[in-house]
C-alpha cells in the first residue's frame, strides 16, 4: 500500500490578523506547513496532497518548487469537505494519512506509532487526554471501543465530561475513506462537513478502529493566533535545546537559545545565552560559543572558540581557531587551524592560514592568506573596482603593518614585511620590506586656525 498524505492548509487564520495565510507563519524560521511536509517525508510518504484555499499565490510562491499535489478548496466548508477535494488523487489501496498545516510539532515517531496501530483496512486515530478538553471533539467509547467523535458544540453534558479528545490526525484506507466522505452531511451546529463523522461510519461498517497517543500533547496543538504561535515556538525551542543537551552540549540557559535549523554537536560543547543557530550547522568537540553569537550554515571544528556577538555564516572555523568578539565570517570564509580573528574583523570568500591572526578592525575579502601571517589593525584588501572583484594572495609568514591597503590583484611573497600605513598596488617579493608612506614633515612656527567670534 502506498502512503498518501493529505495536509489541510486552506484556512485564512483570521485571528492571526495578517495577510499571510495561517500555515505560512513560522516556527523556528520555517513555515508551520513546511514542518508538516518535512515530517510527512520522514514517515515515507509516497505522495502529498496539499489542500489549499486562501492565499494560494503566497503558498505556491513559498512551497511551489516541492513535489506536492495542489488541491484547491474553493469554499471552506469543513474538514470533511477539505479532504474530499483530494479524492481524485487517492487510490483505493492507498493508506491515507491526514495531517494539518497548522499543527507543526507532530513528530515522525508519533505518526509511525499511529500507522503501526492501524489494523489491516482499519481506521487509526490519534487521540490525547487533556485536563481541560474544552473546544475539542470528544472520543466516544463503548466497552473501551471507539464508536464515534462528537464535536464540542454538538456534545451533551455526559460527553462534555470526556477528557480524551480527537486531534484530527488519522490513518485510513483509501477506498473506505472516499465512500465515507460521500456520506457526510452538514446537518450540525456548525453547518459543516465534519471529517470526524467518518469514525461513526467506520464503526457502523464494522471497520476496526484503533487509537494511538503522542508522547506530548504539545505535538498536536495548533496555532490560531500569535499568542499560540509564540507558545509553539517556545515548545519547539525547548525540545530542540533538550536534544542538544542529550547529545553533549552544555547550555548556559536552555530557555535562551534559538535553534532554527539542523544542528549537530560533539561532546563538551559550551553554548552561552542568546545564541542563534540557523540552517545546517555542525559543531565539533570542546567548542565554546559565546553569548549572542549567530551561527548560520557553518562548520565549527574541535576546540574552536566563537567569542560573544560574532556572526559565522556559510563559513568554516578550523581546529583550535577562534573568532571574535564582534567578528564576522561571511560566506566562503575559512579560518584554518589555530587561526584567529578579533573584534570588528570581517572576512568574505577568504582563507586565513594556520596560526595566522587578524586581531582587530580589518576587512579581508577575496583573499588567500598563508600560515603564520600577522594582519595589523585597519588592514583592508581593496578587492573591488566598482565592476569586478580581484584576488589578494599573502604567502606564509608575512607581517602586514597597521592601516595597510592591499589593492588587488596583488601578491605578497613569503616572509615580506609591509610597513604601517602603506598602500600596496604592486606585487611584493619574498622577504622584502615595503613602505609607501609619504615622508613625515615637521613645520615649526605653525599656528592652528582660531574660530572667529560672531
From Swiss-Prot:
It catalyses: alpha-D-glucosamine 1-phosphate + acetyl-CoA = N-acetyl-alpha-D-glucosamine 1-phosphate + CoA + H(+); N-acetyl-alpha-D-glucosamine 1-phosphate + UTP + H(+) = UDP-N-acetyl-alpha-D-glucosamine + diphosphate. UDP-N-acetyl-alpha-D-glucosamine binds at residues 8-11, 22, 73, 78-79, 100-102, 137, 151, 166, 224, 330, 348, 363, 374. Keywords: Acyltransferase, Cell shape, Cell wall biogenesis/degradation, Cytoplasm, Magnesium, Metal-binding, Multifunctional enzyme, Nucleotidyltransferase, Peptidoglycan synthesis, Repeat, Transferase. It holds the Pfam family Hexapep. It is found in: Cytoplasm. InterPro entries: Bifunctional_GlmU, GlmU-like, GlmU_C_LbH, Hexapep, Hexapep_transf_CS, MobA-like_NTP_Trfase, Nucleotide-diphossugar_trans, Trimer_LpxA-like_sf. Mg(2+) binds at residues 102, 224. GO terms for cellular component: cytoplasm; membrane. Pathway: Nucleotide-sugar biosynthesis; UDP-N-acetyl-alpha-D-glucosamine biosynthesis; N-acetyl-alpha-D-glucosamine 1-phosphate from alpha-D-glucosamine 6-phosphate (route II): step 2/2; Nucleotide-sugar biosynthesis; UDP-N-acetyl-alpha-D-glucosamine biosynthesis; UDP-N-acetyl-alpha-D-glucosamine from N-acetyl-alpha-D-glucosamine 1-phosphate: step 1/1; Bacterial outer membrane biogenesis; LPS lipid A biosynthesis. Residues 1-226 are annotated as: Pyrophosphorylase. The keyword Acyltransferase applies. SUPFAM superfamilies: Nucleotide-diphospho-sugar transferases, Trimeric LpxA-like enzymes. It is an enzyme of class 2 (transferase). Residues 227-247 are annotated as: Linker. Its EC number is 2.7.7.23, 2.3.1.157. GO terms for biological process: cell morphogenesis; cell wall organization; lipid A biosynthetic process; peptidoglycan biosynthetic process; regulation of cell shape; UDP-N-acetylglucosamine biosynthetic process. Catalyzes the last two sequential reactions in the de novo biosynthetic pathway for UDP-N-acetylglucosamine (UDP-GlcNAc). The C-terminal domain catalyzes the transfer of acetyl group from acetyl coenzyme A to glucosamine-1-phosphate (GlcN-1-P) to produce N-acetylglucosamine-1-phosphate (GlcNAc-1-P), which is converted into UDP-GlcNAc by the transfer of uridine 5-monophosphate (from uridine 5-triphosphate), a reaction catalyzed by the N-terminal domain. Homotrimer. This is Bifunctional protein GlmU. It comes from Shewanella halifaxensis (strain HAW-EB4).
Amino acid at each position: 500500500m502506498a502512503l498518501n498524505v493529505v495536509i489541510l492548509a486552506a484556512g485564512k487564520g483570521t485571528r492571526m490578523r495578517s495577510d499571510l495565510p495561517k500555515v505560512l507563519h513560522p516556527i523556528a524560521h520555517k513555515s508551520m506547513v513546511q514542518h508538516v511536509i518535512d515530517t510527512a517525508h520522514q514517515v515515507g510518504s509516497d505522495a502529498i496532497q496539499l489542500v489549499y484555499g486562501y492565499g494560494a499565490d503566497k503558498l505556491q510562491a513559498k512551497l511551489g518548487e516541492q513535489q506536492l499535489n495542489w488541491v484547491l478548496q474553493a469554499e471552506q466548508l469543513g474538514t470533511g469537505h477539505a479532504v474530499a477535494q483530494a479524492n481524485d488523487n487517492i487510490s483505493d489501496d492507498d493508506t491515507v494519512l491526514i495531517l494539518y498545516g497548522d499543527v507543526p510539532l507532530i513528530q515522525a515517531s508519533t505518526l509511525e506509532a499511529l500507522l503501526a496501530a492501524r489494523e489491516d483496512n482499519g481506521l487509526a486515530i490519534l487521540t490525547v487526554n487533556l485536563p481541560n478538553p474544552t473546544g475539542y471533539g470528544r472520543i466516544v467509547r463503548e466497552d473501551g471501543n471507539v464508536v464515534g467523535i462528537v464535536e464540542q458544540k454538538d456534545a451533551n453534558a455526559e460527553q462534555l465530561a470526556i477528557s480524551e479528545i480527537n486531534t484530527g490526525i488519522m490513518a485510513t484506507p483509501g477506498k473506505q475513506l472516499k465512500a465515507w466522505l460521500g456520506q457526510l452531511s452538514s446537518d450540525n451546529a456548525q453547518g459543516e462537513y465534519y471529517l470526524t463523522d467518518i469514525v461513526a461510519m467506520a464503526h457502523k461498517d464494522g471497520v476496526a478502529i484503533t487509537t494511538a497517543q503522542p508522547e506530548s500533547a504539545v505535538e498536536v496543538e495548533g496555532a490560531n493566533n500569535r499568542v499560540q504561535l509564540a507558545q509553539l515556538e517556545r515548545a519547539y525551542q525547548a525540545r530542540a535545546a533538550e536534544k542538544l543537551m542529550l547529545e553533549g552540549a552544555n547550555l548556559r540557559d536552555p530557555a535562551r537559545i534559538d535553534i532554527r535549523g539542523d544542528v549537530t554537536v560533539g561532546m563538551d560543547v559550551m553554548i552561552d545565552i542568546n545564541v542563534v543557530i540557523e540552517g545546517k550547522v555542525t559543531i565539533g568537540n570542546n567548542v565554546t560559543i559565546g553569548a549572542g553569537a549567530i551561527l548560520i550554515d557553518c562548520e565549527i571544528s574541535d576546540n574552536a572558540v566563537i567569542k560573544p556577538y560574532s556572526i559565522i555564516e556559510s563559513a568554516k572555523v578550523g581546529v583550535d581557531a577562534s573568532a571574535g568578539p564582534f567578528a564576522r565570517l561571511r560566506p566562503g570564509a575559512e579560518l584554518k587551524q589555530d587561526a584567529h580573528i578579533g573584534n570588528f574583523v570581517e572576512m568574505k570568500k577568504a582563507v586565513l592560514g594556520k596560526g595566522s591572526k587578524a586581531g582587530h578592525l580589518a576587512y579581508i575579502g577575496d583573499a588567500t592568506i598563508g600560515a603564520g601571517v600577522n594582519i595589523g589593525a585597519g588592514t583592508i584588501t581593496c578587492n573591488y573596482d566598482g565592476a569586478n572583484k580581484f584576488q589578494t594572495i599573502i604567502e606564509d609568514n608575512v607581517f602586514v603593518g597597521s592601516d595597510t591597503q592591499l589593492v588587488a590583484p596583488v601578491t605578497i611573497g613569503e616572509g615580506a614585511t609591509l610597513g604601517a600605513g602603506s598602500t600596496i598596488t604592486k606585487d611584493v617579493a619574498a622577504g622584502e620590506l615595503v613602505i609607501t608612506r609619504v615622508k613625515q614633515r615637521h613645520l615649526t612656527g605653525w599656528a592652528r586656525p582660531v574660530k572667529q567670534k560672531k
